[in-house]
């Protein structure tokens, strides 16, 4: 079986919903990343077999294909857009790696993009062509209509209740995320991930959601979103805009082209869970991944779990017995933000730049009751 390696990874800084990036469509968010890869790796770009991107609330029309054409890549390069909800970006990386393992191609661009600010409004279509009532807008995607179809916030509350994750634990974890993120912005770790872009004449190179100086006591002042609950705006991620791209190729080819370091994809797992508890998806996903590769949690140096809600990450940490020295050691989405279709690819990008780590996992809890996880080693 061929081996797939990630040899380059970059992302935009993540903008807040309605923030600096609010006027940019998904393909426009991706354009500077594609252009960066074109300029830095011209010999490789000419050999691309496919572009695979995750996206959840975009404007349709196969964003991967639209974006590569907008960026000026050859029209002979195909593109495919994947929707596995929040896990789409990680799924795109696994898809590309598996295609290489199977011998279907040797060079792929994978990643993800989301503009929550530019997400189209959706209107329910009437059953009758003669309908005269005012149109009804969809408030959100329906994740599991045949079940109780909880919102993501209700799902986080369900997880918090089942796994006894208190409000205090959730606020403590959120504070940790902001502190670690701020530290790793200051020391330059996170800046390695980010490609500065010019937006309306200004350089944009810092995640807008980060609150580096928020006092710890402030987290307890926020009211629960659901009456009587524990999930608040402070211990949940924000809605965000942003894009991520990774260059993935067959290992021998990477060496031939002069790439000397990166991530080796070892394996990936996607599972289903009760849709009422979507945030717990990383637990069986990571457990299955470890079992399949004859590893234990202690064998993994870094585990990146997307921080949609403090409740779900704390529950996963407790269920898997993950130490603080392993989990989200540069902070996470509670501070940096969660552009849905890009977030999984961002986790892998973060692992890419942890040059002193050897064995790593990225994992996502996914709306509708899913979880995915991928195992990487350094090459």
Curated annotation (Swiss-Prot):
GO biological process, any: fatty acid beta-oxidation
Species for this entry: Staphylococcus aureus (strain COL)
Name assigned to this protein: Putative acetyl-CoA C-acetyltransferase VraB
One Pfam family here: Thiolase_C
Gene3D superfamilies: 3.40.47.10
Molecular-function annotations in GO: acetyl-CoA C-acyltransferase activity
EC number: 2.3.1.-
NCBIfam families documented for this protein: AcCoA-C-Actrans
PANTHER family given in the database record: 3-KETOACYL-COA THIOLASE, PEROXISOMAL, ACETYL-COA C-ACETYLTRANSFERASE YHFS-RELATED
The organism's place on the tree of life at top rank: Bacteria
Family: Belongs to the thiolase-like superfamily. Thiolase family.
Entry keyword annotation includes Phosphoprotein: no
Keywords, ordered alphabetically: Acyltransferase, Transferase
Record-level GO cellular component terms: cytoplasm
Residues forming the catalytic site: 86, 338
């Amino acid at each position: 079986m061929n081996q797939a390696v990630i040899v380059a990874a970059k992302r935009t800084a993540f903008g807040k919903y309605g923030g600096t990036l609010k006027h940019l469509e998904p393909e426009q968010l991706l354009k500077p990343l594609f252009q960066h890869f074109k300029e830095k790796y011209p010999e490789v770009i000419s050999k691309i077999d496919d572009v695979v991107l995750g996206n959840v609330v975009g404007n349709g029309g196969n964003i991967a294909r639209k974006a590569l054409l907008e960026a000026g890549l050859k029209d002979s390069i195909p593109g495919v857009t994947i929707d596995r909800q929040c896990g789409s970006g990680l799924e795109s990386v696994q898809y590309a790696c598996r295609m290489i393992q199977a011998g279907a191609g040797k060079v792929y661009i994978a990643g993800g993009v989301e503009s929550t600010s530019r997400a189209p409004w959706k209107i329910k279509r009437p059953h009758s062509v003669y309908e005269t009532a005012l149109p009804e807008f969809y408030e959100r995607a329906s994740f599991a209509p045949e079940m109780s179809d909880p919102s993501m916030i209700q799902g986080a509350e369900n997880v918090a209740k089942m796994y006894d994750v208190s409000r205090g634990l959730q606020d403590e974890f959120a504070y940790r995320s902001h502190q670690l993120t701020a530290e790793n912005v200051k020391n330059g770790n996170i800046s390695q991930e980010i490609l500065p872009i010019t937006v309306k004449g200004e350089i944009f190179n810092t995640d807008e959601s980060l609150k580096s100086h928020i006092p710890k006591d402030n987290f307890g002042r926020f009211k629960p979103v659901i009456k009587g609950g524990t999930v608040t705006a402070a211990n949940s991620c924000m809605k965000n805009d942003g894009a991520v791209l990774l260059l993935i190729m067959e290992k021998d080819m990477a060496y031939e082209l002069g790439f000397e370091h990166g991530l080796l994809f070892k394996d990936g797992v996607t599972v289903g869970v009760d849709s009422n508890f979507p945030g717990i998806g990383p637990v069986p996903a990571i457990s299955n991944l470890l079992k399949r590769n004859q590893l234990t949690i202690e064998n993994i140096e870094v585990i990146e779990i997307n921080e949609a809600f403090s409740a779900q990450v704390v529950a996963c940490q407790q269920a898997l017995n993950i130490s603080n020295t392993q989990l989200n050691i540069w902070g996470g989405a509670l501070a940096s933000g969660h552009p849905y279709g890009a977030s999984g690819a961002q986790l892998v990008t973060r692992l890419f730049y942890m040059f002193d780590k050897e064995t790593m996992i990225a994992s996502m809890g996914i709306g509708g009751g899913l979880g995915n996880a991928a195992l990487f080693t350094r090459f």
